[in-house]
Amino acid sequence: HNYNCWWDDAHLNHNLNMTSPFWGEFGIASLPHIESVRRYLAEEKDRWPSRPGDHFRHHTPIFGTMGEFGKLSQYSGYFMPDTTLAEFITGSQLAQVVGVRHTLERARTLWPETTGALYYKMNDNYPGVSWSSVDYYGAIKPVHYFVQKSFAPLTGVLLFDRTNLSSQEVSLPLYLLDDCRQLNGKDYTVSVTVYNDRLDTVVCREFDGHGELETVKKLGNLNLNRAQTKSTMLFFVVDVCSEGKRLSRNYYFTNYEVRRGVIMSMPRTEITMKRDGRQITVTNVGKLPAIGVYVESPGYAHEFIASKNYLWLNPGESQIIEVNVDYPVCVKGWNIN
């Protein structure tokens, strides 16, 4: 177990670098879906900012007795301002994404020295701030969908040792993870594309190989100079392709601490949505990449499940998302008009 992030107030960088022969409990506690928070706040659902002794602070891991609101403010504040409850929740949930996915991915690259990692944790037994990826009422947090990418049997992984790379020279190890040996005997290309805060391409590099029996393979390092990392945001998109098809996509975001809220202020693009029963097709019809694209069913977060969410869509790209409800759904994203 390791709780230096959260109980010891460690920076998120700590979780980016942690290693262990086997992982149990770790990560960052985060707020539930906003519908769930408003549900347990009851008559205080429209009160913000939070005040000492209110419902909001009581619904924390030790009922507000261990400075939990300060910890929430610290980790949420790496990403978002605290002007509104919605922004505070978003920042908290993004901190959980970073605090979990990087640790899991580093652990996978260390096989067999690291033999496993428990997914701490799936659900919860109390409505409030928690390490869970599904809150007490059943609403799914963003970390669930990012961990889907991190735990995919076939994926490309970049390792980071810090969250802020701005104006620094960096060398990022790139790994190919192929648990089921899907690429065995096949040629493949792993491409890494880096975007800045204008969503201009900074670097695009391809790593070619031929699949063997390895489940973990280091492909090399992605090197960036100070000019290339000088940006209020950097995004890294890792695609694994073989036989003319993209087989997986993983993506990362850094430098967000430069300015609170910057991650949600990227140049905008446009997404269309087409529904056929429980199958949702989302398409980027704009001229820029679409970041963090997700579908949801307003008012039904406690029932709603998507097959995948928080997608990166390049211009012209489409993805099909399966949902489990017949209720109305909508599409949102971090830079969607």
In which residue ranges do the predicted regions lie?
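Substrate-binding clefts and catalytic carboxylate motifs of secreted carbohydrate-active enzymes
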Residues: 2-186
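Extracellular ectodomain segments of secreted/surface proteins
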Residues: 154-169, 253-276
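A structural signal for the main folded, soluble domain(s) of proteins
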Residues: 156-158, 163-167, 182-188, 217, ...
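Short beta-strand elements of extracellular/lumenal beta-sandwich folds
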Residues: 170-178, 276-289
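Terminal connector regions
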Residues: 178, 215-267, 325-337
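Short acidic, flexible loop segments centered on an aromatic residue
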Residues: 180-198, 285-303
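Intrinsically disordered, low-complexity Pro/Gly/Ser/Thr-rich segments with frequent PxxP/GP/PP motifs
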Residues: 188-190, 195-234, 301-327
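Intrinsically disordered, low-complexity Ser/Thr/Gly-rich stretches
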Residues: 247-250, 254-261, 292-318
